[in-house]
């Protein structure tokens, strides 16, 4: 073989080797890319909500195509407000007021590409997946033992005879506590409302709970006679035969929605996240409404026992800033 032919042959071998290396690297990186294309879902939902969403995604063929991480409302809210669209998540389910506030700050969500038949109007970038409504609940046996009249209002829980016998959620830790504060401010205004809250907190004493489910647990256990929390939990407890009753307070039943939104990463994963969002809205609701019985979409119905008698909305839009104002109001009332 001549020197020139030898060089040509070597050059050809080197070229083929280089090409094979490129294909090997592309194959390796594409497998990593496949991994990175999994939709990352952040949610503040509890176990029942997560189960409903995952069932819908699995039935739609998305098993193995997403990674779901559950975070507390304050933790996920903090990440949204600090990181904006740099957040790892492609899809979030979260308290609607946090979605509104993070959108105002960062414009981080993509308009939803699908339509729904929601009963109320919502921004173009999210739709509700569930709603929670506040109410009073009581342990009927403890009321009898203590000779207490069933309360008709939040203000009734400030009476001296209820001292040490009331449990409420702390607005500093739980959004359920915000439902109570909204009711007090709406009915009594800030001046009288502060006194009502002061007297209520004094009666609550050590029964101020960090979890929205804390009060119903204490009422069910008979540790206190009355509490404020999520209405559907009291309805469920009563239906199970527990000595629990629910009371729609005269100040009103206020609600908070949790919604789904797609973070606009402007890539193929964003498109897949959008399809998953549509699946959750359209397929998970049948399970979600069972555990959170508030009708949000046309055609949905709930039993009469799940319809609050005093359903109300706060006069101002719910935002993180308003929550912080009401947290200060609560602390100042102590």
Predicted regions and their residues:
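Conserved N-terminal structural module of periplasmic/extracytoplasmic solute-binding proteins
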Residues: 31-88
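A ligand-binding cleft/hinge motif common to bilobed small-molecule-binding domains
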Residues: 97-103, 220-221, 225-243
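A bilobed periplasmic-binding-protein/Venus flytrap-type ligand-binding module shared by bacterial periplasmic
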Residues: 137-142, 257-268, 288-291
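Periplasmic-binding protein-like
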Residues: 165-172, 197-201, 208-209, 240-264, 279-301
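Extracellular/periplasmic bilobal clamshell ligand-binding domains
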Residues: 303-334
